[in-house]
C-alpha cells in the first residue's frame, strides 16, 4: 500500500490477496491488483463561486471463479453554500456526475460482460437553524428539507433509510451504485451543547 497527498491532491495504490479457508477443492485465492485512487479537491469555480472536486478510481480483480473484473470510475462534484441574510435560510447546493465502466472477463468463454453507467444528480439541502442559549447549555433545532433530482437506474435497488443516512445525498455504497430516482428527504436535526463539554 502506498499513498501520497500534496496540497489539494491525493494518490494511493494498493494490492491485496485473500485466501478463503472455507472453500475446499476449488480456487481459494482472490486478488486485488491493483486499486488506484487519484483525487483533486477544492478547485475554485470562478464562474459560479462554488468548489469543484474530482475523484478517480480504478480496480482490477481476479475472482474465485478465475474470472477477471475491472472497474474504472470518474466523478466530478460541485458544491456551493448560500446563506440568506434576510431569512437566515441556508442553501447547500450540490451537483454530481459519475461515470463508471465495468467489465468481467470469463477466460475461455464468450460470456464477457461490459457495462458503462452514468449517474447525474442535482440536490439542495435547505435548513433553518433555531438556536436557544441559556446559562447551562445551548440548543439548536434545525428543520431540514432536501429535494434531490436524479434519474432512475437499473443498477441500484431501494435503499434503507435510518437515523444515520436520513439526510444523505446518496445512500448507496460502492462505485457502481447510486441511489435511484427523484426524492425528498425531510426532518429535524437537534444538537445540545452542555457547558460541561457534553454534546448530544
Residue ranges, per PLM feature:
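Outer-membrane beta-barrel proteins and related beta-barrel translocases across Gram-negative bacteria
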Residues: 1-200
